[in-house]
Structures are given as structure tokens and as C-alpha cells.
Amino acid sequence: MPRYSKRSKERLASCDQRLQDLFNEVIKHIDCSILEGNRSKERQNKLYDEGKTKVRYPNGRHNSNPSKACDVTPYPVDWEDRERQTLFAGFVLGMARSMGISIRWGGDWDMDFQVMDNRFDDFPHFEVRG
């Protein structure tokens, strides 16, 4: 069974309990890495300046404590494999639904099951709703 690294565990611990519950279940089935949980002001604004996020601090879901968002990708990481990211997200979304956790994925912001209609794709991004 896959396990999180120490770093992934630390990042996940900075997240909302619902995200912790969800991704602690996901890791039992699919090997994945927690790339980011809570973000500092400096980190959020740096990512904004690099065009990797659309909002400055404190307007991001990563900026609350605990974080309402986390960035997670299947392991090993392959940024070029869009299909793998989408398949992983489908598993996560299904798992969340079965657990009664409402989330939104950065590969389908409007959650209409159309992944080609986004102006900004953020495939590793998952956030709790409500």
C-alpha cells in the first residue's frame, strides 16, 4: 500500500480536516504526493507573479489556516500527462462524493465535466466547497 512521505504528511496536516480525511483515504488506493497545503503571503504572491495562480494573498483558498485547498498529484509526477492527472482527479472526486465531501478541482473549475473549457488549468488543485 502506498504511503505519504514525511513532507507530504506535513503539508496535508496544514489543510482542512475534510481534505486530510479525503487524501488519507486516496493514498490507500493511489500513490500520490501532497505538493502544497497552506501558503504564506510570500509564496502566494510569488506564484501570482509567476502566473501560476490567479489571486494574490490573502484571496487564495491556500491562504486560510487551515488551508481550504491542497495541490496533489499522482506519483511519480509527470506534468506532461494531462490524461493521468484527469484520471486521478476523477478518482479523487468520486472518493470525495462517496465520503460526503464537496470539493472543486482546478481542471474543471465550473464542475461541468468539461475539462477543455477552462481559461486556467490547475490540475493538482483541489479545494473544499462551503
Predicted regions and their residues:
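Extended, low-complexity, intrinsically disordered C-terminal regulatory tails
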Residues: 23-54, 98, 106-108
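Glycine-rich, flexible loop/turn motifs
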Residues: 8, 43, 122
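A general structural signal for well-ordered alpha-helical packing
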Residues: 19-23, 44-45, 69, 89
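Phosphate-binding glycine-rich loops and adjacent basic patches that engage nucleotide phosphates
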Residues: 6-9, 50-57
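Active-site acidic/histidine clusters and adjacent loop/turn architecture
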Residues: 1-33
